[in-house]
């Protein structure tokens, strides 16, 4: 496993590089954000086998982990300093987030039942955990169709700061899970 210092060194190494947008295999990911409609993956780092760190052109940092299960799933985990992304039992916040995230994607405004159906059809699930000023947001999506996951996760995260301890424990947890 990489130490927090090693991850920091990797971040510094990539910080000043101008790289071509990383194209997810078989799919060109254009992430829809109101302020930045062309947000794209700007750099890719392999942290471990089946574990990849992506930096988006809008500043968000994302970890991708392919599951080892029979049906390949993509775990998309982001660290954001945008505050609490907690969702009440009725999931109004999640519905509002989904409505924003998928606007312009053909999904349109979603009712609670429509959101459940959209999530089921696209095999997307979402959870969040708050730690201090950071929010860990985890989305599970199909490996062969990751875009709905990015649509759901990307709206709130326009800039991210990495808390070294959270990043390290998150990375270790992902490696343990693999």
Kindly give the residue locations of the regions a language model identified.
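M16 family metallopeptidases and their MPP-like homologs
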Residues: 1, 70-103, 107-159, 170-178
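Proteolytic maturation boundary segments
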Residues: 1-89
């Amino acid at each position: 496993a990489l130490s927090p210092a090693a991850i920091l060194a990797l971040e510094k190494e990539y910080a000043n590089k101008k790289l071509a947008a990383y194209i997810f295999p078989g799919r060109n990911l254009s992430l829809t954000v109101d302020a930045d409609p062309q947000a794209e993956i700007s750099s890719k780092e392999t942290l471990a086998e089946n574990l990849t760190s992506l930096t988006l052109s809008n500043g968000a940092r994302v970890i991708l982990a392919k599951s080892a299960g029979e049906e390949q799933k993509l775990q998309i985990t982001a660290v954001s300093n945008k505050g609490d992304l907690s969702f009440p039992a009725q999931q109004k916040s999640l519905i509002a987030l989904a409505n924003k995230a998928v606007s312009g994607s053909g999904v349109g405004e979603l009712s609670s039942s429509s959101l459940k159906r959209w999530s089921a059809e696209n095999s997307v699930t979402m959870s969040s955990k708050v730690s201090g000023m950071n929010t860990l947001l985890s989305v599970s999506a199909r490996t062969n169709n990751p875009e709905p996951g990015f649509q759901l996760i990307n709206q709130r995260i326009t800039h991210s700061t990495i808390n070294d301890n959270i990043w390290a424990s998150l990375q270790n947890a992902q490696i343990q899970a693999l």
